[in-house]
């Protein structure tokens, strides 16, 4: 599923979806959506299912208290967590490749914000 800007912002604010920037770390360091986490698609490909599950578990434990509660109460498994990926812009395919890699590892609830950081910054400029 491809999210439009408004739906993406809704997901970011909800605290109920893990927001993943699928670009290399140097691009993430230059600019990223607040409250998103860098997980380059090539890194996902190299991680084992166990490592990826542990990575998401740690991020959720530290930054997503609502999701952590659902997991603790067995209402949600780690591989069912809502994830939204994004990359640079609508011509970039890193977020799509991240989705494919996540699905190969058993994650089932993944969406994409295809506008990427370029569209995001058009809508929400950086304060100078």
Give the positions of each predicted feature.
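Flexible, polar/low-complexity N-terminal or interdomain linker segments that lie immediately upstream
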Residues: 1-33, 128
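Short coil/turn linker and secondary-structure boundary residues
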Residues: 3, 44-47, 115
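Mid-length scaffold segments of soluble, non-membrane domains
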Residues: 18, 22-51, 55-56
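Catalytic cysteine-centered active loop of the rhodanese-like fold, especially the PTP/DSP P-loop
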Residues: 55-120
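Active-site neighborhoods of enzymes that stabilize oxyanions during catalysis
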Residues: 122-128
């Amino acid at each position: 599923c491809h999210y439009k800007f408004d739906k993406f912002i809704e997901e970011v604010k909800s605290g109920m979806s893990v927001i993943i920037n699928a670009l290399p770390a140097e691009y993430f360091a230059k600019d990223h959506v607040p409250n998103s986490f860098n997980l380059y698609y090539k890194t996902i490909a190299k991680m084992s299912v166990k490592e990826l599950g542990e990575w998401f578990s740690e991020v959720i434990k530290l930054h997503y208290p609502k999701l952590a509660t659902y997991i603790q109460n067995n209402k949600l498994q780690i591989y069912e967590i809502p994830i939204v990926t994004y990359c640079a812009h609508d011509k970039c395919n890193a977020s799509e490749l991240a989705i494919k890699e996540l699905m190969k590892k058993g994650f089932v609830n993944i969406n994409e914000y295809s506008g990427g950081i370029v569209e995001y910054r058009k809508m929400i400029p950086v304060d100078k």
